[in-house]
Amino acid sequence: DIGNINSVAHSYLRFERPRSFFAPMSFGNCGYAFPTIIGAKVARPDRPAVSYAGDGAWAMSMVETMTCVRHGIPVTAVVFHNRQWGAEKKNQVDFYNRRFVAGELDSPSFAGIARSMGAEGIVVDRLEDVGPSLKKAIDMQMNEGKTCIIEIMCTRELGDPFRRDALSKPVRFLDKYRDYV
């Protein structure tokens, strides 16, 4: 999805086959990841489909879990739950002298919501459980036809923003746009 999750995934995940990673990049379309993997799974049911999203972006598309359950579309979603809009909050630290506006998220258990919709829900609160939980979820997806939501409980530390220029005046290269702010 968009935000720091996308930046980290793009920097560290490696794939052996083309068309294995879809990302919104800097378009800012929050809630992109989950619907995208649902479409990818329908197109290629023989391949695992995994999305990564922060808790803010996840809240925009999590109801599609029910769509997956109802229509037998097995996917895996990994939700990083740090109870805040991390990228936005970091920009407020860097550009607005720690004046926080609408950066906090008070969210329920996403794994619990997934279970209430008929999917599997796994809560991970220890780093050493991330790998085994992901393997279990992908196994359920590929061998049992189940959708699984992995909720990773994260610290509230703020990472570097994925776009340091997010609040800077853009550089205009074409003359016709130079007068625009």
Model regions and ranges:
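Short gly/pro/ser/thr-enriched loop/turn and capping motifs at secondary-structure boundaries
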Residues: 6-7, 28-30, 58-59, 83-87, ...
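Short acidic, glycine/serine/threonine-rich loops at helix termini
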Residues: 9-14, 35, 62-64, 87-92, ...
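Conserved thiamine diphosphate
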Residues: 43-136
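A short acidic, glycine-rich active-site loop
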Residues: 23-29, 97-105, 181
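Glycine/aspartate-rich loop-and-adjacent alpha/beta segment that forms the canonical ThDP
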Residues: 11, 136-181
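Active-site diphosphate/adenylate-binding microenvironment
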Residues: 1-35, 40
